Design a protein with these regions (language model features):
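Conserved ATP-binding/catalytic core of the eukaryotic-like protein kinase fold
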Residues: 1-196
Length: 196
């Protein structure tokens, strides 16, 4: 569902498109009640009848709304517009960690600062029983002020993760295929080892 400038979603007025991905279109909008700029993620109309995508979208909203941490994208509200669900988030200015990495090597101190902030955000999520399950440079945003923010909890698991084949008490993990090297296996503690 492409929204045009001036479209109203409750108290939110669309200003401009910011981007689109597999799970939705993102717009810059104005919250007319609180007089602030926000980002609105709208599930595309073509997916409105897809119950699995709707479930994942609502799961992401619930997972992120349960968290309140400076290194996790803030969610302010959810709603529906002409049958399409939307999520209202804080508006970020900067670039993804992936985009920063593409610019070339960064100073070690800065890389460690980002890593530390990401770990703090993940720890806060884990403390609330939320496991991200799709952490990659594309899902980390670095603001103009240098703060790393974890995005896209669309694959988040809200309860302790247990998969077929994982023994009781083991932590099952999931990583993006692009983050796993051929012949390598991700272990329970997140380290990669050669497959025997």
């Amino acid at each position: 569902m492409a929204l045009t400038t001036g479209t109203k979603l409750g108290p939110y007025e669309i200003q401009s498109p910011l981007g689109a991905g597999g799970m939705g279109e993102v717009y810059r909008a104005r919250d007319t009640r609180l007089d602030r700029d926000v980002a609105i993620k709208v599930l595309p109309g073509s997916f409105a009848g897809d119950t699995e995508r709707l479930r994942r979208f609502e799961q992401e909203a619930r997972a992120v709304a349960a968290l309140n941490h400076p290194n996790i994208l803030g969610v302010y509200d959810i709603g529906q517009h002409q049958g399409s669900p939307y999520m209202v988030c804080e508006l970020l200015e900067g670039e993804t960690l992936h985009e920063k990495i593409q610019l070339g090597p960064m100073p070690q101190r800065r890389a460690l600062e980002y890593a530390s902030q990401i770990v703090e955000g993940l720890a806060a999520a884990h403390d609330k029983g939320v496991v991200h399950r799709d952490l990659k440079p594309e899902n980390v945003f670095v603001t103009k002020q240098g703060r790393a923010k974890i995005l896209d909890f669309g694959l988040a698991k809200l309860a302790p993760l247990q998969t077929t084949g994982a023994a009781a008490g083991e932590v099952a993990t999931m990583t993006s295929p692009a983050q796993t090297m051929p012949g390598m296996v991700l272990t329970w503690d997140g380290t990669m080892v050669a497959a025997a």
